[in-house]
């Protein structure tokens, strides 16, 4: 009897027309993860990006052909072209594909195709998607369920942000930034929270954003499941409109899975989760922050619905090795002035930055908190300006890099100079580092014994922290600009 391949098992027969799939912007975390899964399923993968990265190197090892730079010739063999929302319609590869009548689909459409014949678990929300997705994937793996997962960050235990499993479970982030999560039709949907972000997608209307989340839940079958954080005011307000089975989680006494008794010691936290039947689990998570304990509570709710054993859940949380750029601990360094701890975090929304600051304060209360922050997008800085000023005022020393534009045009009054002025009006003394090449020397001037340096943001600051770590945080090397 012929053995069915993963490709035959989880795709429509009509997908036989597709042999070569080209990704424009293949180095992105979400794009690269999907490309990696499709490569494993036997498709020929090509792609382009502006530079080599760890992601493109991994894809090349998986058999993908990666072009550096965008050119119309890159798509000449493609049967379908996949693009992310970050790619402009004027990209020569998109123009060439359309001229050749080659289908051009968004990243989420291809993810939806991967999910079509699998048991999909989609995690949406303004914050916490990557961590929650990673925790669910880790629990399922610990329970022996061997899931496929596609995550927007590097899962340290897997050494990758994507993996093809042998079961029919597919665990993936659902992208609300461009509303493309509406393409997905999962069996389980998680909403971690809903706050104003990416408002240009929703015409500046929170009501339109709410309607879109309702539509996302309506993509579940009537026998599916929505797992919703009841602590999120907007998300909980929408529950009566969902019309699907709902499980809630959070700190509220009304939650179906209630998180309580939170405590943190350095890089780990402990908490208890109790369901409506009075059954409790006391878990230790190898990750700091109450926000991460809440993410873990969501993962527990999903796992319990799948009847995963408590010991597998607790083991997965305790062994969790973290995710790249989510409170990533680079180490504690000894330099000419004493001890310096270096941590990097991806958070770029005021609520995310606040949660990271809280985790740092609770885990290391005796340390002075020095933040190097890179704002991400002018529109976000404009829309959430006062919230940014409020949260950035909470650190002991702030070094503010210029806004990472992500392709946007500058907006007057929504830049780092303006943020510095507003912070000075609050009695703070931020330092504006207009040239990132000067960051090392400016940081050297600021450092004291027992500092916790937190690099924060979604732009290229994730590369800068690696070069800072490479100096061992030596004052002499930092002053010499050896980054």
Curated annotation (Swiss-Prot):
Record-level Gene Ontology MF annotations: ATP binding; UDP-N-acetylmuramate-L-alanine ligase activity
Location(s), subcellular: Cytoplasm
Record's keyword terms, sorted: ATP-binding, Cell cycle, Cell division, Cell shape, Cell wall biogenesis/degradation, Cytoplasm, Ligase, Nucleotide-binding, Peptidoglycan synthesis
Catalyzed reactions: UDP-N-acetyl-alpha-D-muramate + L-alanine + ATP = UDP-N-acetyl-alpha-D-muramoyl-L-alanine + ADP + phosphate + H(+)
Xref: Pfam families: Mur_ligase, Mur_ligase_C, Mur_ligase_M
Presence of the UniProt keyword Cell wall biogenesis/degradation in the record: yes
Residues annotated to bind ATP: 125-131
Domain of life: Bacteria
Example of a GO biological process term: regulation of cell shape
InterPro entries the record matches: Mur-like_cat_sf (IPR036565), Mur_ligase_C (IPR004101), Mur_ligase_C_dom_sf (IPR036615), Mur_ligase_cen (IPR013221), Mur_ligase_N (IPR000713), MurCDEF_pg_biosynth (IPR050061), UDP-N-AcMur_Ala_ligase_MurC (IPR005758)
Pathway where it operates: Cell wall biogenesis; peptidoglycan biosynthesis
Keyword Cytoplasm: yes
One Gene Ontology cellular component: cytoplasm
Enzyme Commission number, as recorded: 6.3.2.8
Function: Cell wall formation.
PANTHER family xrefs: UDP-N-ACETYLMURAMATE--L-ALANINE LIGASE (PTHR43445:SF3), UDP-N-ACETYLMURAMATE--L-ALANINE LIGASE-RELATED (PTHR43445)
Similarity section: Belongs to the MurCDEF family.
Protein name: UDP-N-acetylmuramate--L-alanine ligase
Gene transcribed to yield this protein: murC
């Amino acid at each position: 009897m012929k053995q069915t391949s993963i490709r035959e098992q989880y795709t429509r027969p009509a997908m036989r027309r597709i042999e070569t799939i080209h990704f424009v912007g293949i180095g992105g975390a979400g794009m690269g993860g999907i490309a990696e899964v499709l490569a494993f399923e036997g498709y020929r993968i090509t792609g382009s990006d502006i530079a080599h990265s760890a992601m493109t190197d991994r894809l090349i090892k998986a058999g993908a052909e990666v072009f550096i730079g965008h050119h119309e010739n890159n798509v000449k063999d493609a049967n379908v072209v996949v693009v992310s929302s970050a790619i402009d319609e004027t990209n020569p590869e998109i123009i060439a594909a359309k001229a050749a009548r080659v289908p051009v689909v968004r990243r989420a459409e291809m993810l939806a195709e991967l999910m079509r014949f699998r048991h999909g678990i989609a995690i949406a929300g303004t914050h916490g998607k990557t961590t929650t997705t990673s925790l669910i994937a880790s629990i399922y793996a610990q329970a022996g369920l061997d899931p496929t997962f596609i995550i927007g960050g590097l899962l340290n235990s897997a050494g990758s942000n994507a993996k093809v499993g042998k079961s029919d479970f597919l665990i993936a982030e659902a992208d609300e930034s461009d509303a493309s999560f509406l393409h997905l039709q999962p069996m389980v949907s998680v909403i971690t929270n809903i706050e104003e972000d990416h408002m240009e997608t929703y015409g500046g209307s929170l009501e339109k954003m709410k309607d879109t989340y309702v539509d996302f839940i309506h993509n579940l079958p009537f026998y599916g499941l929505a797992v919703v954080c009841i602590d999120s005011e907007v998300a909980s307000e929408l529950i009566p409109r969902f019309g699907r089975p709902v499980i809630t989680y959070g700190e509220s006494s009304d939650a179906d899975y209630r998180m309580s008794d939170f405590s943190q010691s350095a890089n780990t936290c402990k908490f208890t989760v109790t369901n409506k039947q009075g059954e409790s689990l006391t878990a230790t998570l190898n990750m700091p922050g109450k926000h991460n304990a809440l993410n873990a509570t969501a993962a527990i709710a999903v796992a319990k619905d799948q009847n995963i054993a408590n010991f597998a859940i607790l083991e997965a949380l305790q062994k969790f090795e973290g995710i790249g750029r989510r409170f990533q601990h680079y180490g504690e360094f000894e330099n000419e002035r004493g001890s310096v701890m270096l941590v990097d975090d991806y958070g770029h929304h005021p609520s995310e930055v606040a949660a990271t600051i809280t985790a740092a304060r609770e885990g290391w209360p005796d340390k002075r908190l020095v933040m190097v922050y890179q704002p991400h997008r002018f529109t976000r800085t404009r829309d959430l300006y006062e919230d940014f000023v409020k949260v950035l005022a909470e650190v002991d020393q702030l070094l503010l890099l210029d806004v990472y534009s992500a392709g946007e045009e500058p907006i007057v009054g929504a830049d780092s100079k303006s943020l510095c002025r507003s912070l000075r009006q609050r009695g703070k003394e931020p330092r504006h580092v207009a040239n990132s090449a000067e960051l090392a020397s400016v940081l050297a001037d600021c450092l004291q014994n027992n500092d916790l340096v937190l690099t924060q943001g979604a732009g290229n600051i994730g590369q800068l922290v690696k070069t800072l770590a490479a100096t061992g945080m030596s004052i002499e090397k930092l002053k010499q600009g050896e980054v």
